C-alpha cells in the first residue's frame, strides 16, 4: 500500500510495558503510518517515557519522530509514578535503556500534534494510551483541530459496562485519573472520540503461554517477554489472570479491526474532584434524565464489550510477523 493511502496515526503514549506492546503492534500494521510518537507523564515521568519511546523506535527500526510533551497534569498535583507496575524505568527494570541517551525531536508534543493535524486535514487519527494532557493542550492551542482530525481513539476510562470499574481507584482508570481535567476536556470537545476502557481491555489477556510462544519466535517477542515478567506477576496476583492485560494494544487494535468492538454512544463526563475523582461516566443516547452535566455535549463512542480472543489473536499475529 502506498504511504499516501495509509491512515496517519499520532501515537500519544507513556511507555510503559503495554505501551511498548502497542507500539510494536502498530509497527506490524501495513495499513497504518505513524506520523509522530508523542510522550507524556504517566507510567513514569516524561523524561523516562520519552527515553523509552526513543529507545523502542530505534531498537525496532520504527522511523518516526518522537516529541516530548506534558510533564504534569493540567490542574491537579502529579501523583507518584506506578513503579510497582511498570518498574522504575517504565520498562520492567531489566536494564534495557541503561546508558541510552538520545534527544527527542525539537518541539512540544502538543504543538507538533496541531501542526500535523492541520497539514493533513481529515487524515489523522490520534491514538492516545496515556493521560490526555497533550490532547487537551493541543485543543487549547488550536480548537480548530477538532474539526480536522479523522478520529481520536483512547485507551482510557472505566464505564462500569459489565461491572468493570477502576484500577487507579475503585472507580477511576489510571490514564483518566492521572489528569481528570484533561480527560474531561477531551471527552467534551466537539470531535469524534472512541474510548476503549477497562470494560474491554481488562478482558484482553495475553497468557503466560502466549508470551512464551512469542518469545521463542523472534526479537520483538523476546523483548516483550523480558520486560513483562513483573507485569505479568502483578496481573496474576491482582486480577487473578494467567498472563497480563493488553490495555493499550486493545485500543490500537480498534484502528485496524473495529469490527471486534461493540460500541455505545452517549456523552461522557469525568469527575474532577472529590473521592470519585477520575471516574468516567457515559450518559447513553436516548436515556432521559433531568438536567445534568452531560447536557449539550456531543456523543462519544465507548466500547462496552469486544471479541477479546480476537484482539489477543491480532496481537499475537502482529508480534509474530515482526520476527
Ligand atoms: C492504562 O494505564 C497505564 O498504566 C497503561 O499503560 C494503560 O495505558 C491502563 O489503565
Ligand atoms: Ca499507557
Language-model regions, residue ranges each:
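Short secondary-structure boundary/hinge segments and terminal tails
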Residues: 44-45, 74-77, 204-205
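Short, well-ordered secondary-structure micro-motifs
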Residues: 77-79, 163-165, 206-208
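Short, glycine/acidic-enriched capping/hinge loops at junctions between secondary-structure elements
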Residues: 21-23, 48-49, 77-79, 281-283, ...
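A residue-level signal for conserved active-site and pocket-lining positions in enzyme catalytic cores
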Residues: 66, 186, 252
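Active-site histidine-anchored catalytic micro-motif
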Residues: 3-13, 17-55, 95-201
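Conformational coupling and interaction surfaces
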Residues: 2-6, 25-26, 33-34, 174-177, ...
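Metal-dependent C-N hydrolase catalytic cores
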Residues: 7, 50-119, 297-310, 316-320
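Short, surface-exposed amphipathic charged segments that create phosphate/polyanion-binding patches used
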Residues: 80-87, 166-170, 211
